[in-house]
Amino acid sequence: MEILIKIFLALHIAGGTSALIAGAVAMVAPKGKRVHNIAGKTYYWSMATVCASAVVMCFLKPQQFLFYVAIFSFYLAFTGERMTKRKRQSDAAAIQDWTAAILAATAGAILLVRGGMLLNEGTSFGWVNIVFGAFCLGFSANDMRLFVKPPQEKMHWFFTHLTRMIGAYIATFTAFCVVNVKFLPSLAVWLLPTVIGTFGIAAWQVYYRRKFALQRV
């Protein structure tokens, strides 16, 4: 059992390291170009490795929080990648989109309940569960709403792709910080990347909205 855990932990670390590097390259590379596409694919499959190895380790050595966060993290990467295949309003959500959204919504709801229970017990880590759960449930619920009533915005796919891929990167970077950053309080290490990353995503969206607006002039 211990050997299996070590093997999957090694895969988990390798996948996480690859995701951090490939994700950074994809973010700075020109969008739609060869380097961005290759780095993006590498990032996506690295995230799949991180999620799969985390789920297996959770079964070998039960850790509920890690299990649900793994689902949330990969859901972000999965939906980000799927948006590149669903650019048109006529591209309806497939069975895998609905399945992933329902799983993510379930994970988000469980994290919220778990967070409330932990706070009730006086454990501040409950806030981490609540924040991750709220994002997970919010994203998945909004996705299902848009499956039924597709958005009218032409570049919706691009902004969703950007938001989800960077969101997954934030989750991976958070895991890196939790393991390596020891000089900050645990709660800050868990939540600061999300706070900073959310502002970063907002700034990036403003930049591209202005860029696309200028291109239409």
Q: Can you annotate each of these PLM segments?
A:
Residues 1-217:
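Alpha-helical membrane insertion/targeting regions
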